A protein has these predicted regions:
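Charge-dense, helix-prone N-terminal extensions
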Residues: 1-191
Length: 191
């Protein structure tokens, strides 16, 4: 297993400089962040993500280290990695500010070509896939409960279904979503 560096930057400028010099060679890093009220200054998560996007990188898992300190994994974005609406909004901002590096622009080009750029558009817009809607049509209670959930809960179900790669997995997830919604369970995490 590759040992990844653990890096701490006070500012996004330092992070940008590191990525400028290392974005092609590094496999990933753990960035250290401190809470706003902590005695140690650190760049904010949002700043780190924006800089990462400039170079075709993305954030991933986070781990609390206690005492207002946390570690978050950042790495080059995989070609088939889907793009959230938030990250696409950041990209628009970064392009307007002329902050995008060519490696980040190349990542976007690949994503647009392979469909991962728009893969979450229906999820972000709350569009229920036809197969799930048919299942809801057979269970009015599940559908009514689903419609009463906050948009974030509905979106999490749509995302869960969207990420299924095989048809058999999609069918299992549809059945699970219907069962949970029928029981008025807003999230798979609260079972």
């Amino acid at each position: 297993m590759i040992e990844l560096p653990e890096l701490y930057f006070k500012t996004d400028i330092e992070w940008r400089e590191w990525l400028h010099n290392n974005h092609n060679a590094a496999k990933g890093v753990y960035l250290i962040f401190y809470k706003v009220a902590h005695e140690n200054d650190s760049m904010r998560w949002e700043e780190a993500v924006k800089i990462a996007l400039c170079f075709g990188w993305i954030d991933s898992t986070v781990k609390s280290l206690g005492n207002g300190k946390r570690r978050q994994y950042f790495c080059p974005r995989k070609p088939k990695s889907v793009w959230s609406a938030l990250n696409k909004t950041y990209i628009k901002e970064l392009k307007k500010q002329n902050l995008m590096h060519q490696s980040g622009l190349n990542t976007i080009k690949i994503a647009k070509e392979n469909g991962s750029w728009s893969a979450l558009d229906d999820v972000e817009n709350g569009i229920i896939p036809e197969a799930l809607q048919k299942a809801f049509d057979y269970n009015k209670n599940a559908y009514d409960n689903y419609l009463n959930f906050a948009p974030s809960y509905r979106k999490s179900y749509l995302y869960y279904l969207n990420q299924a790669k095989r048809e058999s997995t999609r069918q299992k997830r549809i059945a699970e979503i219907i069962e949970l919604c029928d029981a008025n369970i807003k999230s798979r995490d609260t079972r």
